[in-house]
């Protein structure tokens, strides 16, 4: 057949009369527009795709379950490319057969980040599949529906410099935590406590005596508040305090629900059947997130929650030995308290240590918060009233801590509701040296000895470091046991100090502050300068994460944030605000603030953006961020190879080279940056590879093990591969410096989970000597990707050290490092495909609300079988942009196999049901009126210039070649 008829009908036309047609359009069913924009808030009610109406940052982690399956808009592009690259194989029967690279095809489909969770209508009488648009409903025969996919776009706003074809790039940057705002860690009195002055003394030389209730400045029952004189006296150690539990208003209803469960348990005479662990965890979950919401939780949260539920079931059994001990009759013991005590024991055993407010798992954090509302300082009460002590197997120091009380808790500054002027405690964190004036000859080694004497300095523990090196030489790299905090001295150890645990309320001395309070700590190996101090709130709480809450806020520059390795001292959030589904809404101030950075215009000119918008679109910010990130990473890593230059010339380091010449594809993905690093620095190639090739190179390297992995590296990067092969005969330090490039292959990715939250990988650090340090990936001390890695690479050795002869230990260390990287699977903790790969529709819908509005369409591909195999695209859409532009956008969906797309037909429908048709390529059209009995409709006749269409199972065949 060379002609396809598509009926277009309005309300009142009997649909069953069109049963013989494979593709029909109902222009009588529509969603009313509001204010000239499509009402995207109706999407959850439509037969379209699965996006919930919720906060945009919450929506990023929604697992789509209300759908009829996923489709890939580019599945034809991928499979056609696989078809094009078939290889002929002569079989034993001398018959020639063709085989596609099915491994590549399967990887491409799995790696696609634009999967659409469709929620369609199914007509079981005629077996049609219905897809809703805002101006129409499209139905297609189920035999042909496998190539249908939505084609939605946000309309560009010229004043904002929009380039919405880069929406995927924006999506990518959020996933790799490079489009985020930060707030420093904030600490305050736990809102679950009332801290009451019980007694006072005039100076610290007077001890507090049991039973003494002497009051000097305050009346009985005075509660301590941070903006009150009582707090100053407390910090001076002049007050003896009593802690009582209280319920914050924000979680009062949730605590009441827990109380109902507790009361049912008590009234049933402690029947374990009344303890439904899943129901308990549901309420606790709400409490945990309201009190300290990090929005993104650990990937293994679900598994740990199940273990917690099992521990609850076990601990409430009537014959559990510890339960029997808790139920021994003593004065002051109450059943309500016992309920929360048993919850605490179950949670502590689940995590195998004491639980603190800073615990990363909300299911444990929340049970602590709930228990504190009833018991005050929980662990202290468990020890003094119930004779329960933390296990000897728990983390070090927890045994000694149960004698004290801890009144401070970490709170997320993004959510903390407080008026300007309120006193808080917070961590300042900045780079010790953002840049330095150096020469190639002197290098930029890590300086152990800061110029300021009035600081605490984080130092390496030579004994512990020596023990680690001996273990590595004798037994290889132990990724589970080698930790950075273990090789640092205890004083000023920024990986172990924790104000929540170090500031405590003692029985005799009142509150004692840690010695590092209000003092600068310099950690040279992290290039970090930190101080915890009292500060004031500067701005009210806002949904916009870019609003800086304090008078001394953390940096906003996205590249500086990538250099702040010690992420335990700040919180981050995607720089997005508002709802996932909205017709029109305000944009975060993030983009406007980033546009004020030095060099902003120069960076954008590299991307072809000459006119700089005052209020840029997020796609502009995304281009700026990734371009600057690429230049910064290249500049830092170039210092680690031997260079022919003026060794005494002074230059600023690190500093991105805005004049760096590179060619080829635009950089839209971190994998392109990583591949470019090796191409540019080692292979002297300035061409940027496309995103698919770059991602596949990284995948192939990860897929191999041992010698095969090194061979694949050498296949793509011959010069770098030969340098790795020469490690066995390494003679000077420069010969082993190339090892520090290997982590690039394994740390970054937008759909990966590290194998463990606290495994470490080896990295060379250059001080006055060459050291190897454990770089912890995915741990509580850093974020993800290259954040854990980048700042260490700012350090590089002097020329004298580069050319110094390797000692025997260094040579052995280098071989063990290469062995580790040849076999590591640190990146292979699984993925989160259902969540991560289905968010492109969400980003496009959200971006539409920030810019010019939303347009939608749906595309179907018709296979042509004669005289030459090809495809044509048929799209039904609204009329908000010219059809020629829509056709161009369809061509962009075929970056790998565009030669097969020989034409397109665009059917555009306006708000009142009128339609126009546009065609190009081998497609032409004719619109006719059709009378059927007493009913009328219109038929769009698509003609294909002598080409014959057919092959209903085109996609099925392509996926099985």
UniProtKB/Swiss-Prot annotation:
Keywords: Capsid protein, Clathrin-mediated endocytosis of virus by host, Host-virus interaction, Inner capsid protein, Viral attachment to host cell, Viral penetration into host cytoplasm, Virion, Virus endocytosis by host, Virus entry into host cell. GO terms for cellular component: viral inner capsid. The keyword Nucleotide-binding does not apply. Its main location: virion. GO terms for molecular function: structural molecule activity. InterPro entries: Capsid_VP2_Orbivir. It comes from the Viruses. It is found in: Virion. GO terms for biological process: clathrin-dependent endocytosis of virus by host cell; virion attachment to host cell. Pfam families: Orbi_VP2. The VP2 protein is one of the two proteins (with VP5) target of the host immunogenic response. Responsible for viral which constitute the virus particle outer capsid. It is the major attachment to target host cell, probably by binding to sialic acid. This attachment induces virion internalization predominantly through clathrin-dependent endocytosis. Belongs to the orbivirus VP2 family. This is Outer capsid protein VP2. The lineage of its organism: Viruses, Riboviria, Orthornavirae, Duplornaviricota, Resentoviricetes.
């Amino acid at each position: 057949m060379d002609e396809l008829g598509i009926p277009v009908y309005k309300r009142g036309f009997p649909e069953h009369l069109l049963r013989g047609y494979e593709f029909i359009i109902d222009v009588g069913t529509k969603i009313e527009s509001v204010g000239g924009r499509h009402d995207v808030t109706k999407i959850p009610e439509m037969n379209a795709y699965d996006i919930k109406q919720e906060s945009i940052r919450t929506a990023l982690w929604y697992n789509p379950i209300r759908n009829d399956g996923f489709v890939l808009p580019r599945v034809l592009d991928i499979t056609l490319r696989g078809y094009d690259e078939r290889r002929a194989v002569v079989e034993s029967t001398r018959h020639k057969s063709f085989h596609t690279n099915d491994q590549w095809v399967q990887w491409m489909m799995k790696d696609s980040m634009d999967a659409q969770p469709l929620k369609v209508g199914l007509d079981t009488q005629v077996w049609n599949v219905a897809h809703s648009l805002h101006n129409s409903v499209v139905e297609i025969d189920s035999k042909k529906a496998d190539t249908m996919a939505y084609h939605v776009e946000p309309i560009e706003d010229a004043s904002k410099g929009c380039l919405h074809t880069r929406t995927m790039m924006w999506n990518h940057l959020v996933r790799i935590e490079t489009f985020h705002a930060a707030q420093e860690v904030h600490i305050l009195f736990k809102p679950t406590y009332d801290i009451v002055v019980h007694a006072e003394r005039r100076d610290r030389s007077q001890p507090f005596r049991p039973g003494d209730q002497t009051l000097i400045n305050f009346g009985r029952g005075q509660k301590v508040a941070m903006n009150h004189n009582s707090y100053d006296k407390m910090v001076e150690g002049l007050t003896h305090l009593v802690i009582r539990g209280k319920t914050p208003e924000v979680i009062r209803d949730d605590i009441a629900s827990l109380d109902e469960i507790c009361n049912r348990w008590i009234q049933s005479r402690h029947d374990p059947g009344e303890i439904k662990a899943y129901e308990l965890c549901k309420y606790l979950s709400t409490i945990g997130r309201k009190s300290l919401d990090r929005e993104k939780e650990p990937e293994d949260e679900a598994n740990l929650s199940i273990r917690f539920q099992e521990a609850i079931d076990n601990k409430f059994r009537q014959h559990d030995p510890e339960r029997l001990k808790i139920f021994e009759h003593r004065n002051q013991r109450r059943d309500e308290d016992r309920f929360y005590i048993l919850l605490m024991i179950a949670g502590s055993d689940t995590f195998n240590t004491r639980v603190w407010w800073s615990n990363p798992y909300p299911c444990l954090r929340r049970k602590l918060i709930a228990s504190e509302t009833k018991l005050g300082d929980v662990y202290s009460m468990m020890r003094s009233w119930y004779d329960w002590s933390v296990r000897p197997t728990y983390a070090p120091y927890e045994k000694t801590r149960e004698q004290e009380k801890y009144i401070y808790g970490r709170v997320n500054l993004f959510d903390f509701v407080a008026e300007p002027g309120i006193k808080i405690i917070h961590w300042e964190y900045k780079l010790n040296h953002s840049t330095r004036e150096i020469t190639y000859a002197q290098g930029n080694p890590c300086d152990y000895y800061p110029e300021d004497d009035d600081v605490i300095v984080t130092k390496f523990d030579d004994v512990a470091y020596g023990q680690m090196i001996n273990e590595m030489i004798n037994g290889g790299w132990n990724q589970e046991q080698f930790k950075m905090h273990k090789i640092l001295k205890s004083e000023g150890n920024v990986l172990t100090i924790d104000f929540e645990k170090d500031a405590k309320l003692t029985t005799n001395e009142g509150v004692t502050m840690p010695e590092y309070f209000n003092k600068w700590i310099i950690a040279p190996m992290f290039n970090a300068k930190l101080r915890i101090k009292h500060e004031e709130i500067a701005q009210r709480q806002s949904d916009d994460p870019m609003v800086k809450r304090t008078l001394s806020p953390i940096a906003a520059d996205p590249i500086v944030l990538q250099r702040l390795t010690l992420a335990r001292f700040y919180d981050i959030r995607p720089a997005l605000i508002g709802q996932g589904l909205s017709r029109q809404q305000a944009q975060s101030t993030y983009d406007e603030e980033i546009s004020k950075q030095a060099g902003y215009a120069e960076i954008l000119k590299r991307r072809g953006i000459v006119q700089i918008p005052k209020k840029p679109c997020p796609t502009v910010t995304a281009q700026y961020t990734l371009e600057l990130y690429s230049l910064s990473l290249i500049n830092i890593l170039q210092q680690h190879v031997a260079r022919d230059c003026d060794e005494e010339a002074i230059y600023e380091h690190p500093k991105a080279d805005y004049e760096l010449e590179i060619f080829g594809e635009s950089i839209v993905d971190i994998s392109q940056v990583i591949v470019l690093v090796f191409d540019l620095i080692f292979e002297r190639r300035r061409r940027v590879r496309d995103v698919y090739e770059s991602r596949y190179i990284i995948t192939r390297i990860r897929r191999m093990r041992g010698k095969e992995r090194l061979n694949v590296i050498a296949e793509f990067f011959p010069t770098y591969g030969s340098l790795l092969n020469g490690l066995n005969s390494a003679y000077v330090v420069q010969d082993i410096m190339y090892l520090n490039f290997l982590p690039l292959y394994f740390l970054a990715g937008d759909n990966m989970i590290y194998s463990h939250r606290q495994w470490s990988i080896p990295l060379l650090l250059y001080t006055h000597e060459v050291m190897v340090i454990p770089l912890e990936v995915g741990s509580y001390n850093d974020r993800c990707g290259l954040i854990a890695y980048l700042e260490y690479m700012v350090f590089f050795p002097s020329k004298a050290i580069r050319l110094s002869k390797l000692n025997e230990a260094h040579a052995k260390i280098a071989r063990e490092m290469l062995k580790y990287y040849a076999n590591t699977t640190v990146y292979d903790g699984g993925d989160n495909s259902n969540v991560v790969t289905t968010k492109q529709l969400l980003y496009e819908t959200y971006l539409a609300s920030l810019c010019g509005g939303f347009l939608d369409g749906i595309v179907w591909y018709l296979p042509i079988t004669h005289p030459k195999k090809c495809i044509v695209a048929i799209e039904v859409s609204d009329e908000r942009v010219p059809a020629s532009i829509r056709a161009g956008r369809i061509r962009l969906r075929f970056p790998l196999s565009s030669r097969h797309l020989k034409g397109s037909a665009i059917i555009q429908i306006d708000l009142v049901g009128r339609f126009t048709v546009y065609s190009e390529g081998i497609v032409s059209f004719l619109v006719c009126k059709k009378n059927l009995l007493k009913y009328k409709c219109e038929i769009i006749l698509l003609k294909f210039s002598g080409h014959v269409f057919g092959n209903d199972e085109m996609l099925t065949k392509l996926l099985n070649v």
